[in-house]
Amino acid sequence: MFKGNSKLKSIFLLGFLLSLQLAFTSYINSSFLSGFSGEKNVALIYIVSSLASLAVLFFVPEILRRMGEYKFLLVSSGLTALSLLLISLLRSPSVIVVFIFCFILNYLVIFALDELVQIFSKNSSMGKVRGLYLSVINLAWVLAQLISGETLSKWNFSTLYFIAFVIMALFLVFAYFGLKNMVDPKYDKVLGWKSFKNFFANKNLVRAYAINLLLQFFYVWMVIYTPIYLYAHLGFSWREIGVIFTIMLLPFVLIQFPLGKYSDRIGERGMLILGFFVASLATLSLFFIKRHEVWIWALALFSTRIGAAIIEVMSDVYFFKHIKSENDEFIAIYRNTSPVSYVLAPLVAFLVLNLIPSFNFIFLILGTLMLYGIYLSSTIRKSDI
């Protein structure tokens, strides 16, 4: 995999650093923002950030063709580092505007790394490469949760954002030296709307998009509302939440590489069905857990992520098997499932939270919704893989 491919090693390191930065801040963003906007307006900030991200992602393939992958990555990561520094320093509501810019920039860096993995990996070993890449970036999430819970028990949110800035500064340095003299592929010259038409005319890409959208919706609800439920409703401390989330994320490190390797030989259909079944059942079980016990919540959330880890790697492998390295516009569309989810999930949650009798009903609704993924996965045929 890495033999004679030093650029791929650099990309994996960059993926690790980016994920470390994201993991340090993702689970505290909602609590941090609520201090400036009020708890009720946090969803609105996420919606605005996501809509702006979708608008920018629409033009990214054209920007990439003009700038080249290397320069695009340096500019977007440099601006991300700057925005994180400002977030760590600002103490006024203006920090919300900087957060929105940072939110958009993170998606640009994620897109750039996705494109780089596609360029420097061979299609025949796509499952192995994607599985290992996901394991590496999710290792960063585990380590960050282990550290951030302890950090928050001693310092404030601003400290974590400053640590995230330092990580992105390192990212910029490694990107500058590690990807020098890279050669871009000949990108498709397709207009924005036409790329959407081509994407959604392909049943395999549409199916991959729908599966990933459902997974991203799951992530958004979990990222925004699980910390709130554990902290505000069940009385867990941030140190306890850090331990819970560290254990919760272990499946992403332990099983994604073997699963990716396995998918190269077997295919994705059966594993996707299994993943959605496990994620749905485990999420439904959260509705019934009302005790303040770290080990119970750690085990329950660990189970939800076993399903999510299976879905994530199989969805990515299935998608990337059906595109070529020059199809950068398709990657932009596929990755917009995350900002789309950050629009849909808070809107749905706003309606749901005004109708349900208690907060824990969100897990009952989310678990039921994940059952639809079993049907989606069952529509994959052997000829589609």
Name each model feature, range by range.
Residues 16, 94-109, 213, 295-310:
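Hydrophobic core of transmembrane alpha-helices in multi-pass small-molecule transporters
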Residues 2-51, 206-211, 215-244:
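Helix-loop boundary and gating motifs at the non-cytosolic
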Residues 103-137:
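Cytoplasmic helix-loop-helix junction between adjacent transmembrane helices
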Residues 78-91, 277-291:
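C-terminal ends and interior cores of transmembrane alpha-helices
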Residues 153-166, 353-370:
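A membrane-interface helix-boundary motif in multi-pass transporters
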Residues 56-69, 152, 255-267, 353-354:
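Helix-to-loop junctions at the C-terminal end of transmembrane segments
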Residues 1-8, 180-211:
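Juxtamembrane intracellular "pre-TM" segments in multi-pass secondary transporters
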Residues 65-77, 265-276:
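Cytoplasmic membrane-interface "Motif A"-like loop-to-helix N-cap segments
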